[in-house]
Curated annotation (Swiss-Prot):
The gene is dszD. Belongs to the non-flavoprotein flavin reductase family. It comes from the Bacteria. FMN binds at T60, A61, T62, S63, N77, I78, A79, E80, T81, S82, S83, S84, A111, R117. The keyword Transport does not apply. In association with the dszA-dszB-dsz operon can be used to remove sulfur from polycyclic aromatic sulfur compounds found in gasoline and diesel (biodesulfurization), which are a considerable source of pollution. In addition it may be possible to engineer the operon to make specialty chemicals. Can be engineered to make it more active, suggesting it may be possible increase the yield and rate of the biodesulfurization process. Coiled coil: none annotated. This is NADH:FMN oxidoreductase. Its EC number is 1.5.1.42. One of its GO terms (molecular function) is FMN binding.
Length: 192
C-alpha cells in the first residue's frame, strides 16, 4: 500500500505555536524538521462525516484519540484552512469511522476535493439521526460535539460518544489502516 493521499490532517498538540511566515516556527525550530518528526509517528486513519444541512460533509483525519471512558469522550483536530471547517463548527453531531486496512480507497477519497467525497452513493447511507455513515467500516461512533477549542492553526474537537457500531464479519474485522511517512500500512504483530 503505497499511494499517497492528496491531504491528510496532521497531529497537533495544545502547546504547538502557530506557523510563522518563515521556514522557522516561532520557537526557532525548523518547520520542515517538525513536520518530518511528526511523519515518523504512525497514526490510525479515520474518516469524519456529518450533515451540514445542505448535504453530507466528510474528511480524512489521523488525529483521532480517546479522551475519557466515563463519560465516553473522543477527540480529533481539523485545520482552520480545511474546506470542512465551517460545517464542522456548525454541526451538533458527527460520525467517526475507524478505517480498516481494506479501506485505503476511502481514506484517499475523503482527502480529495470536497465535491468528490460523496459522489459514489453506493459507499454510504444516512443514519436515522441524519449523519452519513460509510459501509463496511470495522467500527464507527456517532458523536455529539461537546467542545470546539481553537489551538494554533487547528480546532480541537471533543465529542461525547452516543452510539458505537462494530462490524462482526471477517472482512470488516480486518486490521486497522495506518498512515506513516506518507504511506498507508497495516499493522503486523511482533514475534512472540
Amino acid at each position: 500500500m503505497s499511494d499517497k493521499p492528496n491531504a491528510v490532517s496532521s497531529h497537533t498538540t495544545p502547546d504547538v505555536p502557530e506557523v510563522a511566515a518563515t521556514p522557522e516556527l516561532s520557537t526557532g525550530i525548523c518547520a520542515g524538521d517538525y513536520r518530518a518528526a511528526l511523519r515518523r509517528h504512525p497514526a490510525g486513519v479515520t474518516v469524519v462525516t456529518l450533515d451540514s444541512g445542505t448535504g453530507p460533509v466528510g474528511f480524512t483525519a489521523t488525529s483521532f484519540s480517546s479522551v475519557s471512558l466515563e463519560p465516553p469522550l473522543v477527540s480529533f483536530n481539523i485545520a482552520e484552512t480545511s474546506s470542512s471547517i465551517n460545517a464542522l463548527k456548525a454541526a451538533e453531531s458527527l460520525v467517526i469511522h475507524l478505517l480498516g486496512e481494506h479501506q485505503q480507497h476511502l481514506a484517499q477519497r475523503f482527502a480529495r476535493s470536497a465535491d468528490q467525497r460523496f459522489a459514489d452513493e453506493s459507499l454510504w447511507a444516512v443514519l436515522d439521526t441524519g449523519e452519513p455513515v460509510l459501509h463496511g467500516t470495522p467500527s464507527w461512533m456517532r458523536v455529539k460535539v461537546d467542545q470546539l477549542i481553537p489551538v494554533g492553526d487547528h480546532t480541537l474537537v471533543i465529542g461525547l460518544v452516543t452510539r458505537v457500531h462494530a462490524e462482526e464479519d471477517d472482512e470488516s474485522a480486518a486490521a486497522p489502516l495506518l498512515y506513516h511517512e506518507g504511506k498507508y500500512y497495516r499493522p503486523t504483530p511482533l514475534g512472540q
